[in-house]
């Protein structure tokens, strides 16, 4: 475990306090974020809402948001819906954990993503292949193999 990187992640989450500018609903699989309607450039989505683990990001949740440049997805997020970041033209960086295995089709359509960071536990799969398949240009990918927190 790299303590220095762990501390950087923790500080980033604390520096970017979770905004209340999301809509969400409870599903059979867990809490789903259905929409982000804020205007922050850096968005850190919560790991839990009302004591429930956030496991999904709905289709079109960030669609056409021109303000967001960096998004930190919840640690236990398992699914990103279709076109979740559709036409987020200024989205440059996406940070995610190893639980995310299902990246919906077109999730990054219309984005100019430059960088992806994946924090994973050894031996776990990730959705990196799904992300790279959608890219039509060069992106930088950083893989960190250790505990998320």
Question: Where do the language-model regions lie?
Answer:
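A subset of signal/propeptide-processing and intrinsically disordered low-complexity segments
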Residues: 1, 10-11, 16, 85, ...
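Structural signature of tandem-repeat unit edges
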Residues: 19-30, 37-55, 66-79, 89-102, ...
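The feature captures the LRR N-terminal capping module
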Residues: 2-32
């Amino acid at each position: 475990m790299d303590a220095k990187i762990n501390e950087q992640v923790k500080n980033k989450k604390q520096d970017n306090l979770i905004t209340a500018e999301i809509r969400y609903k409870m599903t059979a699989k867990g809490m789903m974020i259905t929409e982000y309607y804020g205007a922050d450039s850096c968005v850190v989505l919560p790991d839990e809402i009302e004591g429930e683990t956030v496991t999904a990001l709905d289709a079109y949740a960030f669609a056409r948001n021109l303000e967001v440049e960096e998004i930190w997805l919840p640690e236990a997020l398992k699914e990103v819906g279709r076109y979740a970041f559709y036409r987020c033209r200024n989205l440059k960086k996406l940070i995610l954990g190893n639980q995310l295995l299902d990246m919906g089709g077109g999730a990054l359509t219309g984005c100019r993503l430059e960088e992806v960071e994946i924090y994973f536990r050894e031996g776990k799969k990730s959705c990196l292949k799904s992300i790279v398949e959608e890219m039509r240009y060069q992106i930088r990918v950083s893989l960190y193999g250790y505990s998320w927190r």
